[in-house]
Structures are given as structure tokens and as C-alpha cells.
Swiss-Prot record:
Protein name from the UniProt record: Photosystem I P700 chlorophyll a apoprotein A2
Residues annotated for [4Fe-4S] cluster binding in this entry: 558, 567
Location relative to the cell: Plastid, Chloroplast thylakoid membrane
GO-annotated biological processes: photosynthesis
Residues annotated to bind chlorophyll a B1: 653
TM ranges: 46-69, 135-158, 175-199, 273-291, 330-353, 369-395, 417-439, 516-534, 574-595, 642-664, 706-726
Function: PsaA and PsaB bind P700, the primary electron donor of photosystem I (PSI), as well as the electron acceptors A0, A1 and FX. PSI is a plastocyanin/cytochrome c6-ferredoxin oxidoreductase, converting photonic excitation into a charge separation, which transfers an electron from the donor P700 chlorophyll pair to the spectroscopically characterized acceptors A0, A1, FX, FA and FB in turn. Oxidized P700 is reduced on the lumenal side of the thylakoid membrane by plastocyanin or cytochrome c6.
EC id: 1.97.1.12
Family: Belongs to the PsaA/PsaB family.
Record: residues binding phylloquinone: 670
One Pfam family recorded for the sequence: PsaA_PsaB
Cofactor annotation remark: P700 is a chlorophyll a/chlorophyll a' dimer, A0 is one or more chlorophyll a, A1 is one or both phylloquinones and FX is a shared 4Fe-4S iron-sulfur center.
Gene behind this protein: psaB
Length: 733
């Protein structure tokens, strides 16, 4: 008999029911639980899968480059970035009628095309690419690299090349290599690219492999570097009248500290960015020599952590035992990595619009809105994953003996205090924020809008003023002729002060009562999500009710017969509930960003300022007003280029609604449904030609919840993606 799926679990493979298939899929990547898994094999499998992941990423980016080179209008866009719409790829669809063909033939194309809202055109243009051949070369190079990584992944699974567990647990060597190599040398290489290729391209000079070694990036060459006169590289920067991509108004500086934005492209100065990456390279290459490995010099991570014990004795054993706890737990390491990447992803969203790094990105409003939404949603999912693996760490890897009295154990001991404080903050934020919104709604409804409670965010405005924003008049507190004032003014970069006080960018936007309220609504969402996730992780091993549920595992569900009252210790349920809150929080955040910017881009900030102080304002003047094109996207009188987004908006709602079918039903319902279907199948002559051996059983509680949550999340994201792209591109083209 052929071996049945899944091969990695003898127990599941011999399960006579359809559970075999679903549980097999669910645990396919849970290598730890597979038959015959050793620690060594576990580390090697994960290591090899990293190469596969990187290969997929390179293949994907290669595909982006290839399709734009083949079907896009990159060269034409480069001639007039503000007026030519960038093409992602052509659309070939046999369902397109003549109106659709006409509606989607744009951007100077001869057939229907998709417009690119990913910012790749701006990125490639900024880093010095100018022709389709450049894009093809990049595509082929990345394709080659993807192949290389697939080979490397396979190679490291072969006995001769498979690293030992000791290699994976050599934390100091890994830190040194990642700091110096991954961050340091790659930043240095990027500085090199910016200085040798991108900056010359921005000044109208093409540097490729044929002239790379003969073209000096700076007229003085390396002489200033070796003589210590580094300031020479900052002299003669591009002027305010510089036309990007030409020599008009260009300077010769390569490493500057101008601050602010290039007046024409509205993006950060390339020479500032080169300087930034060089500084990071220096810092990280030095940092990568900190830890003790081969030569017996440098820090030992373990010694540092063991020494971190507060002298007063009031903080217990401090960081004792943490090195081994972290180093021996893949889930702990993954949790830390996910938390870091999540924060980084959210920071990317914030900085991509406030300080755009790519030329002409600031003037492409739809792309800005799309990039912000994209990075915030991804950040939310990744951060939830950090807590999930934190909970799995407590269940599978946490050893109370090895962590006696240290910060980890102490955190578990006073988890009641942590959870109750988070609970109190969430309740406070929720009642007060909603109370203000609802009060304002009532005042609007009763015709006395002047009785709204409108609170100016004075502390936030003060922080903005401290960064140099003059709008609020806080400088009245300064003594103008004081020497300290004069000295203080010089710490701001000249371009920064101009940038922060300009009304044409998104840097430190003017804020008022509407911002104050939505800020606290987002704070409510963040604290509630954190409360659910933190409680799920801290109670993962047990609570007062059930002291230790280690053997129940992570995906233990908290309802069903005989499991009454165990909901407070199901880490899976906590994660599941938190994702709903996380999605809500991210949506409030992107609603705020999008509406604030629509008002800014349209030159009418009053609409946001006046309508954002009450809930009806958000529903009517943001959601409804901006979805009107989508609700009327295609009708008996025809269609337009927004019709596809209108259809996606509808389809997203449908997927989202399907989620509730799985969320508001219990396991017995599915079993009944399946048995009814089987009964009908067996009594239908034609259907009896198809036979299966597995006995059909219903989804488990956790599975039904997962299916429901997945539909909810996918529908949610699809709906908002269609909304944000259609409502923005419908206004600004």
C-alpha cells in the first residue's frame, strides 16, 4: 500500500477520517512534532527553508523587473514622472468587452494595462536605473541568485554540508557576522552603489560596468579620504534648482548633511542618504567585532547577562539563565525576531510618506496610500505572530528550574499586575474616547455643534514645536535675544527647518481635536490587542484554575463538552481574538492616515478637521463619501477603470462575510452538515462513481475558528485595498 499523507506523522497517516488531511496540512511546518525529529535535523530543516524563502523573494522581485521591462513604460515614465502613469503589466482577459478594453488602455499603452501603485518605478529610477535593458539585467541577475539560493538550501541538507547543532547555537559568532556582514557590509555596499551609480545618474551621468572604474564619483577622487579632509566630500551639494536626472543645478558633493527634501522630487537628498548608510556601515562593522569568538577578546553574551543582577537584591536573579533560555529556544528567538521586524515594518509605513526616500514618490498619492496601508497591515500580522511564538515558548521550551528568580520568572509571578494594568488602561481609553465621540455625535444631531468637547493636543503640538514647527506660536516662550536661543537654532539642519514648516509635505502635519480623538482610539486598539496577546502568553502554561497545562499544547481550544471554564488558559484562543482587535486597530490607523491625507492632498484640511470629531463624520464623510464610486462602480450605463476595484470591493465583503459563517457556529453544526452531505452523496447513483476511504468528520473547534479568522482577515484586507486604491486614484488619477 502506498504511504498516505502525511509522511511525517505515522499517527495521522493511519487516521481513518478526513482529519488526516486537515491536521496534516496544519502541522506540515511544525517540524518539532514530526516523527523521528532530532534537534539537529530540526535546525537543519529550518536553515534550509530560509534559503527557499530567499529564493522565492528573489524570484518575485525578478518577476516584477521582468514584467515592467517587457510590458511597462519605464523609459517613457522617466522622461515625465509626474504626468505619465507607470504600468505594472498588461492585462489579457477574454472577458473584456470593448468598454473595458478602452477603460484600461492608459499610460500611453496600446492594450489594457494595470497601473503600478507599488512605488517600484520611483525606486528603480532613484537608484540609477534608466532603461529597459537595466531592468532586464536586474531581472536575470536576481533569477540567477534565486537559483543559487535553491541550490544552497539543497546543499546544506546533504550530510557533508549540513551544519551541526553547535554551529547554530554559537550565538556570538552569529551576532558578529550578522552585525558586520548582514548590516555593516551590505550598508557599505549600498553606500557604494549610491555614490558610484545613483548620485551620478541623478546628475545626468550614466555609470555602468563599462565605465565604472574610469568614472570618478567625486572630482577630488580618494585624496580627501586619505588626507583626512573628509569635509571636501560635503562641499558643493546640489542646488535647490537642481533638475533630477540632469546636470542642471547639480553639485559635486557625495556625502552631505543637508536635511529636508529635494525641492523638485520632494524626496530626501540622495547625498544625505549615502551619508546615512555610510554611518550605519561604520557603526555596524565595529559592532560586529564586539563579541568574543576566536581570539579570546571581546564580550561574552553569557557573562554580560549573568552579571546583570541588581545590587539591591530587590530585582531577584536579574538576567541569570537567560542566555541559555534564549539560545536553546527557537520560539523565543522567532518571537524576538518577529517583534523587531513588526516594529520595523510599521516604522517603514510611517517614514515612507513623512520622509519619502524615492524621487517623485511624494507626488504619487495613490502609491503613498497603498504603501502605508500595506506596511501597517503586514506589521500588525507579524507582531501578533511574535506573541504566538512567545506563548509557544512558555508551553514547549520554558524551564522553571533554569529561570528561578530571574526577570522571566518574576514577570510570570506578577502577571496579575501586568494584566490588570493593561485591562485598566484599555477600559479607561475605551470609555473616555467613546464617551467624547458619542457626546460630539449627540451635539451634532441636536443642532448644537458648538457644544462639542474639542480638546487641543497641546502636548503633541509642543513636541512638534520642539522639532522646529513654527505654526503654533510656541516660540513666544523663547527669549529671542538670548545667547542660548541663538545657539539652539543652529542645531537644526537648514533643510529640515524648511521641510518641517512647508505645507506641501507630510512632515509633522498640523493637528487638532480630531487627531487627538483618533490618536486615543488607536491607543485603545493597541492596548486591548496587547492585553489579549500578553494575557494569552502569560497564562499559556496555566492560571489559578489550572496550574500547569503544558501537555495540552498550544492549539488547545477552550470550549466544548467537559472543558468548561478553561478559556482563560488557551493561548490559541487569545491569539485568535487578538487578531480581530489587531485588524480593527490597523484599520483605524490607516483610516486616519488616508482621510487626513486626502484632505491635505486636495488642499482642504477643513473637511477632516470638522468631520473627524464625531463618529457620523467618519462614517459619512470618510467611508461612505469615498466608497461612493465603488458602490456605483459598474451599472446599466457602463463601466470605467474603477470597475475592477468596485468588483473587488464587493468580493472582499463577500469573503469577509463568509468568515462569520465559521465563527458563529459550533462543531456539532458542521458534523450534522457533513453527515447530511454524505447521506445525500451515497443515495445519488451518479455520485457513487466517486468513492473515498476517509470517514468524513467535521472541522475541529480550532480549525473552524482558523478558517473563519482567515476569511475575515483576507476579506477585510481585500475590501480596504480596493477602497484605498480606487478612492485615491479616482480623485488624483
Amino acid at each position: 500500500m502506498a504511504t498516505k499523507f502525511p509522511k511525517f506523522s505515522q499517527g495521522l497517516a493511519s487516521d481513518p477520517t478526513t482529519r488526516r488531511i486537515w491536521f496534516g496540512i496544519a502541522t506540515a511546518h511544525d517540524f518539532e512534532t514530526h516523527d523521528g525529529m532530532t534537534e539537529e535535523k530540526l535546525y537543519q530543516k529550518i536553515f534550509a527553508s530560509h534559503f527557499g524563502q530567499l529564493a522565492i523573494i528573489f524570484l518575485w522581485t525578478s518577476g516584477n523587473l521582468f514584467h515592467v521591462a517587457w510590458q511597462g513604460n519605464f523609459e517613457k515614465w522617466g522622461e515625465d514622472p509626474l504626468h505619465v502613469r507607470p504600468i505594472a503589466h498588461t492585462i489579457w482577459d477574454p472577458h473584456f468587452g470593448q468598454p473595458a478594453v478602452e477603460a484600461f488602455t492608459r499610460g500611453g499603452a496600446s492594450a489594457p494595462v494595470n497601473i503600478a501603485y507599488s512605488g517600484v518605478y520611483q525606486w528603480w529610477y532613484t537608484i540609477g536605473m534608466r532603461t529597459n535593458v537595466d531592468l532586464y539585467n536586474g531581472s536575470l541577475f536576481l533569477l540567477f541568485v534565486a537559483g543559487l539560493f535553491l541550490f544552497a538550501g539543497w546543499l546544506h541538507l546533504q550530510p557533508t554540508f549540513a551544519p551541526a547543532v553547535s554551529w547554530f547555537k554559537n550565538a556570538e559568532s552569529r551576532l558578529n557576522h550578522h552585525l558586520s556582514g548582514l548590516f555593516g557590509v551590505s550598508s557599505l555596499a549600498w553606500t557604494g552603489h549610491l555614490v558610484h551609480v545613483a548620485i551620478p545618474a541623478s546628475r545626468g551621468e550614466t555609470v555602468r560596468w563599462d565605465n565604472f572604474l574610469t568614472t570618478l564619483p567625486h572630482p577630488a577622487g580618494l585624496a580627501p579620504f586619505f588626507t583626512g579632509q573628509w569635509a571636501v566630500y560635503a562641499q558643493n551639494p546640489d542646488t535647490a534648482g537642481h533638475i533630477f536626472g540632469t546636470s542642471e543645478g547639480a553639485g559635486t558633493a557625495i556625502l552631505t548633511f543637508l536635511g529636508g527634501f529635494h525641492p523638485q522630487t520632494q524626496s530626501l537628498w540622495l547625498t544625505d542618504m549615502a551619508h546615512h548608510h555610510l554611518a550605519i556601515a561604520v557603526v555596524f562593522i565595529i559592532a560586529g567585532h564586539q563579541y568574543r569568538t576566536n581570539f579570546g577578546i571581546g564580550h561574552s553574551m553569557k557573562e554580560i547577562l549573568e552579571a546583570h543582577t541588581a545590587p539591591s537584591g530587590r530585582l531577584g536573579a536579574g538576567h541569570t539563565g537567560l542566555f541559555d533560555t534564549v539560545n536553546n529556544s527557537l520560539h523565543f528567538q522567532l518571537g524576538l525576531a518577529l517583534a523587531s521586524v513588526g516594529v520595523l515594518c510599521s516604522l517603514t509605513a510611517q517614514h515612507m510618506y513623512s520622509m519619502p526616500p524615492y524621487a517623485f514618490l511624494a507626488q504619487d498619492f495613490t502609491t503613498q496610500a497603498a504603501l502605508y496601508s500595506h506596511h501597517q497591515y503586514i506589521a500588525g500580522f507579524i507582531m501578533c505572530g511574535a506573541f504566538a511564538h512567545g506563548a509557544i515558548f512558555f508551553i514547549r521550551d520554558y524551564d522553571p528550574e533554569a529561570n528561578k528568580g530571574n526577570v522571566l520568572a518574576r514577570m510570570l509571578e506578577h502577571k496579575e499586575a501586568i494584566i490588570s494594568h493593561l485591562s485598566w488602561v484599555s477600559l479607561f481609553l475605551g470609555f473616555h474616547t467613546l464617551g467624547l465621540y458619542v457626546h460630539n455625535d449627540v451635539m451634532q444631531a441636536f443642532g448644537t455643534p458648538e457644544k462639542q468637547i474639542l480638546i487641543e493636543p497641546v502636548f503633541a503640538q509642543w513636541i512638534q514645536a520642539a522639532q522646529g514647527k513654527a505654526l503654533y506660536g510656541f516660540d513666544i516662550l523663547l527669549s529671542g535675544d538670548n545667547a542660548a536661543t541663538a545657539a539652539g537654532n543652529s542645531i537644526y539642519l537648514p533643510g529640515w527647518l524648511a521641510g518641517i514648516n512647508s505645507s506641501t509635505n507630510s512632515l509633522f502635519l498640523p493637528i487638532g481635536p480630531g487627531d487627538f480623538l483618533v490618536h486615543h482610539a488607536i491607543a485603545l486598539g493597541l492596548h486591548t490587542t496587547t492585553l489579549i496577546l500578553v494575557k494569552g502568553a502569560l497564562d499559556a502554561r496555566g492560571s489559578k484554575l489550572m496550574p500547569d497545562k503544558k501537555d495540552f499544547g498550544y492549539s488547545f481550544p477552550c470550549d466544548g463538552p467537559g472543558r468548561g471554564g478553561t478559556c482563560d488558559i488557551s493561548a490559541w484562543d487569545a491569539f485568535y481574538l487578538a487578531v480581530f482587535w489587531e485588524l480593527n486597530t490597523v484599520s483605524w490607523t490607516v483610516f486616519y492616515f488616508h482621510w487626513k491625507h486626502l484632505a491635505l492632498w486636495q488642499g482642504n484640511s477643513a473637511q477632516f478637521d470638522e468631520s473627524s470629531t464625531y463618529i457620523m463624520g467618519w462614517l459619512r464623510d470618510y467611508l461612505w463619501l469615498n466608497s461612493s464610486q465603488l458602490i456605483n462602480g459598474y451599472n446599466p450605463f457602463g463601466m470605467n477603470s474603477l470597475s475592477v476595484w468596485a468588483w473587488m470591493f464587493l468580493f472582499g465583503h463577500l469573503i469577509y462575510a463568509t468568515g462569520f459563517m465559521f465563527l458563529i457556529s459550533w462543531r456539532g453544526y458542521w458534523q450534522e452538515l457533513i453527515e447530511t452531505l454524505v447521506w445525500a452523496h451515497e443515495r445519488t447513483p451518479l455520485a457513487n462513481f466517486v468513492k473515498w476511504n476517509d470517514k468524513p468528520v467535521a472541522l475541529s473547534i480550532v480549525q473552524a475558528r482558523l478558517v473563519g479568522l482567515t476569511h475575515f482577515a483576507v476579506g477585510f484586507v481585500l475590501t480596504y485595498a480596493a477602497f484605498v486604491i480606487a478612492s485615491t486614484s479616482g480623485k488624483f488619477g
